[in-house]
């Protein structure tokens, strides 16, 4: 293991923490750790020189990203170049990533346009991949998230090199310039559309997810099951499915008695082509380049270990785009791969037998990675430790060969073969999906940790760094793995503990939501105002976004999986349906509801203790006092609420 690689990586991680940390005390601590690590590990002047050059280069790249020359303000005229595979159509709106060509500069932007006719919709849905438009529009910043648990669009788009949104007001189609890349992209899109047009099945969903890295046309329910159980994190997001694909291809080529050198060349060519198929997404690029670098090291005797290859790619990624370190897929892919290297090394040197090694790797990897995964996905199901190992075995032996054969059969129109694969694999995957859906119901098996503080970040990454040092010195023994697993769990447990009381106001559209978190572990009270129903010009009811979807992530991000009380004010029957969805995601002690005076329908049964509040005062199980104030005689029959939380009074006015 090349020490300078991983010390440089650690220095960059510390530098990013210093940049984003608001506390001067913590900034000072990180600076001292960085200086101490630097002095301790580097004795050679030549090493010091090159590491200084790397750090200076990364610093300059960071300055270019965070102090950029952005798209000019105001109304602009230019040329937009789009790839239809990057577009997403939601109702009348189409959004996607595009290249904006102005008179004096080019920019990557977030394209947005509201379609006005079916002809325009058909234009964006054509089979040809590339689309060139002469446009007039306005540049504006990407919308900031309203709540901590909302999707952080500015951070995500900055991490992939996009700093502005371009809202198109009008356009005119231009002729595309022919090129070999556009020909390849057109073939890719035809391939993609052929699979996407097949009847809905689990095999089709897996083909879209793994072969193309696309989730927009996949079954949302299936994806949600996998997210909650951790299957998607370990496979698609980390890029480990590509590693499984490489292992399978190696076995096939060796069985055909093809030499190792020829096999490597064939695999590298195939991986480069596949890289263009997935548009060189972050996790796929990491998996492909790690294989290429590892094989190059063997060929040219560079003596690079797998962990060295991972560190070099980390540094090269920062040279390419420094802001990539903000990307969730980047952090998960590199973090999970580093942890997988540690657990694989432990299994290889301390265990005998393939099955025993597989079980231990499947068990240790998610435990050590628990804080990392929960930081981004908020929850982790205990059964996923076993399910992840099962899915990996199934992917390597059955699913990946089956999915590849299915895709080939669809393209060359072998209908009977594709139907046969769908019949057999769908039976298997349908059974797995029922198991996953059944496992989701057990809330006591679900871990919820929320997002961590900067201190938890630094402790976790130092722990990983120490583990890598142990890897280098060959002292990664069974006791070490136990220590790292316990340390990882302790860091995870420290994340959701609240040292102080908090009252958090959540912005959920037209609704008012208040989350009260007392001092301690996993306790909270949620106050939600019911949605007011509106009618359109024809008298049809209009419902806005479900509050359960808007609120759930904002509770999970705080590390809360148990609610002492849920208060729903001014509720209608539609709100009770949202309430039932919310209760499925949390362990709830009590629900107290005040119905809208105009609501005469029955709410039905809920799975928890439910009480209905009339005019007057009530004390909840959490100690919060709630007073329902009579309607003030206005045209709308609504009732305002007064909440008293630890001496603070909050008035929610129903206007």
Describe each region flagged by the PLM.
Residues 80, 137, 210, 238, ...:
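Divalent metal-coordination and catalytic microenvironments
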Residues 341-448:
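Alpha-helical transmembrane segments of multi-pass integral membrane proteins
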Residues 1-71, 470-475, 591:
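N-terminal leader/targeting segments
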Residues 2-9, 47-48, 305-309, 354-358, ...:
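Membrane-interfacial loop-to-transmembrane alpha-helix junctions, especially the N-terminal start
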Residues 57-229, 233, 549-556, 562, ...:
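Membrane-interface helix/helix-cap signal primarily in integral membrane proteins
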Residues 1-5, 177-186, 205-217, 276-283, ...:
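Hydrophobic alpha-helical transmembrane segments
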